[in-house]
């Protein structure tokens, strides 16, 4: 499908935001605290996933408008109300842990957590944050957690605190640019996939095995391989906020490639149970990855994994709601392979003909 000029602009806008993702925690090996700060990757993913769930389903101007309003980083347009907006807003607030539907309350703790983690890149003062927290606290419990009531509550907060909201949840372009300019942070570049980013972070001893790894083989440099796969799983959101295997997220990628059936779903669940016995996050990640590559369902996993890699560096798929095209994905994956591997290097097993 041809993109409209407006759609092309939106894709470029979104990819600019993607350059600012910094999963610097991707190799952490310890369990994370119960309420950890959200990274730019986390808050962007919350918006992208809720966009997928609630934007206009058609490849149309309505979908373009939803992308511009919800993903464009414009405070004045963010809460522009159409029938889909309240559901999107509640979805985002829940995924960012700012609203608890079961308690019917906003969570002020996440505001302080975000500020403490990222204040060096923000223009907010302690007083700004305290005022925001005070006003959020004064709201108390809502009468219900229906979409409209949550939306109305956030809109009221936006009257005085839209700048604070955008900065604390890392959707403000200035804050993101400040983070991008800080050379001490690792950031993902425009059109760079999660796998490409993680390849640049991986240990030197893995580089001799890069073609084998891209062909879904496991390097003998076990600890480095564990950290590499953990980085990818973080970026793909295959690990949840507690660093547990997110079965639903993996299942979803199988659904998008139309390869999910009862047997493959059972295989994913069994692999997750076994991998979860590993206390160490990198070991858990590699155990899950290895299990999914083992047995009769390995090829469907590769299809899902390849599509996830391509989509992570090309938001056209999301903005335009484009379906899975096996030949197109294969061509893009082979192009990525050739960045590291020539025709003489080992890529055997990369693809099995359908």
UniProtKB/Swiss-Prot annotation:
State the function annotated in the UniProt record: Modulates blood feeding of female mosquitoes on vertebrate species by binding and sequestering different mediators involved in the host response. Binds serotonin with high affinity. Binds weakly noradrenaline and histamine. Does not bind tryptamine, octopamine, dopamine, adrenaline, leukotriene C4, leukotriene D4, leukotriene B4, ADP and U-46619, a stable analog of thromboxane A2. Inhibits agonist-induced platelet aggregation. Exhibits vasodilating activity.
* Major place of residence: secreted
Q: Which gene encodes it?
A: 7DL3
Q: Which organism is it from?
A: Anopheles gambiae (African malaria mosquito)
Q: Keywords for this entry?
A: Hemostasis impairing toxin, Platelet aggregation inhibiting toxin, Secreted, Signal, Toxin, Vasoactive, Vasodilator
Taxonomic path: Eukaryota, Metazoa, Ecdysozoa, Arthropoda, Hexapoda
Report the Pfam families cross-referenced here. Answer: PBP_GOBP
Which GO cellular component does the record give, naming just one? Answer: extracellular region
Would you kindly state one Gene Ontology biological process term found in this protein's UniProt entry?
vasodilation
Which Gene3D superfamilies is this protein grouped with? Pheromone/general odorant binding protein domain
> Where in the cell?
Secreted
Q: What is this protein called?
A: Long form salivary protein D7L3
Q: Which residues form the signal peptide?
A: 1-26
The organism sits in which domain of life?
Answer: Eukaryota
Q: Which family does it belong to?
A: Belongs to the PBP/GOBP family.
Q: Which GO terms describe its molecular function?
A: odorant binding; toxin activity
